[in-house]
Amino acid sequence: MATIRKGNQDDCAAMAEIFNHYILNSNVIFSNRVRSAEDMRQLVEPVVDRFPFYVAESSGKVIGYCFAHKWMPDPVYGRTLEITIYLSHEATGQHIGSQLLERVIDDCHHLGTHRLISFITEGNEPCERLHAAHGFRLMGVLPEVGYKFGRYLNDAIYLKDLC
């Protein structure tokens, strides 16, 4: 059974491990560069005290994380946040992603967020289903914007209205 709790910078090593699995073994992440715990700290530093950030833990080990962050730096986009969510490959299919995403969505709603946006590699069916189940709508596809493992990849844009 997983426990959902607020995330913090002490979780960054485990987050990097989860993230790096997908970098090395899938096209879920449009990157070939492995991340360190310090890289993850820099990523979440502006998030920790300002935006919703949760981790799932089982037997004392972080097995997933989800947070909201600025979609764009310009203040005119301030009421639209982007969602980032990853689960350990061993933790998929256990509704942990739903628990994490629900907490982040609820917190975003209470913050007065107008829209949530998520970019998903087209064909990542578990992630597409997760977002659709939580009210995200497919808004469009950016064709062949990524290239990994010898093939071009599409990025799908999902949007959820909160207000």
What residue ranges belong to the model's regions?
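Glycine-rich phosphate/pyrophosphate-binding loop shared by adenosine-nucleotide-utilizing enzymes
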Residues: 2, 61-65, 153
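A short beta-loop-alpha structural element at the N-terminal edge
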Residues: 3-15
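Conserved GNAT-fold acetyl-CoA-binding loop/helix
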Residues: 16-43
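Acetyl-CoA-dependent GNAT
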Residues: 33-90, 101-102, 161-162
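Conserved catalytic-core motifs of GNAT/GCN5-like acyltransferases
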Residues: 70, 117-120, 132, 137-154
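Active-site acidic-Proline motif in GNAT/NAT acetyltransferases
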Residues: 85-90, 94, 106, 122-123
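Conserved acetyl-CoA-binding loop-helix of GNAT-fold acetyltransferases
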Residues: 93-106, 129-133
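Conserved GNAT acetyl-CoA-binding A-motif
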Residues: 108-120
